């Protein structure tokens, strides 16, 4: 029973973490819309979530690091390395080499893509917690 709850919360935690990371990436793209040569970035949310969940199920935490020197800084257990950032291919080229398409960035940031799904995930987690609390209180 507790394993099911832990797996559910782990999935939701990773989904929220990835959505937050994507929100930061999209915001950085918008902030650099006028920077010459800036390359717009993004992540493949579904692929990253799948990779994270597969790594979590096998008990590994992403890449396995080997310390070959006593001067290496050890990585904390459970630390997740960064998501694979992808370059976004522009629909229209610009003279200064900047690949940020403001219409696309705004639609990904605000219209129901990332932020609405983030809020939906938070709402879902809240409803799960309330349901569990109700079951525990009823005994």
Curated annotation (Swiss-Prot):
Keywords linked to the UniProt accession: Bacterial flagellum
PROSITE patterns: FLAGELLA_BB_ROD
Pfam families noted in UniProt: Flg_bb_rod
Entry's localization field: Bacterial flagellum basal body
Gene Ontology biological process terms in this record: bacterial-type flagellum-dependent cell motility
Keyword set includes Protein biosynthesis: no
Keyword 4Fe-4S: no
GO cellular component: bacterial-type flagellum basal body, rod
TM ranges: none
Domain of life: Bacteria
Oligomeric and partner information: The basal body constitutes a major portion of the flagellar organelle and consists of a number of rings mounted on a central rod. In Gram-negative bacteria, at least four rings, L, P, S and M are present, whereas Gram-positive bacteria lack the L and P rings. The rod consists of about 26 subunits of FlgG in the distal portion, and FlgB, FlgC and FlgF build up the proximal portion of the rod with about 6 subunits each.
Entry function: Structural component of flagellum, the bacterial motility apparatus. Part of the rod structure of flagellar basal body.
Protein family per UniProt: Belongs to the flagella basal body rod proteins family.
Protein name: Flagellar basal body rod protein FlgB
């Amino acid at each position: 029973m507790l394993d099911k709850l832990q797996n559910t919360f782990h999935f939701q935690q990773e989904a929220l973490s990835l959505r937050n990371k994507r929100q930061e990436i999209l915001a950085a793209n918008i902030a650099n819309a006028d920077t010459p040569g800036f390359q717009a970035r993004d992540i493949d949310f579904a692929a990253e979530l799948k990779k994270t969940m597969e790594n979590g199920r096998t008990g590994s935490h992403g890449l396995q690091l080997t310390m070959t020197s006593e001067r290496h800084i050890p990585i904390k257990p459970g630390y997740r390395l960064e998501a694979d950032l992808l370059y976004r291919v522009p629909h229209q080229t610009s003279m200064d080499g900047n690949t940020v398409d403001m219409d696309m960035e705004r639609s990904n940031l605000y219209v129901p893509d990332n932020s609405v799904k983030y809020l939906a995930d938070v709402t879902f987690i809240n409803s799960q917690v309330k349901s569990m609390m109700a079951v525990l209180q009823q005994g």
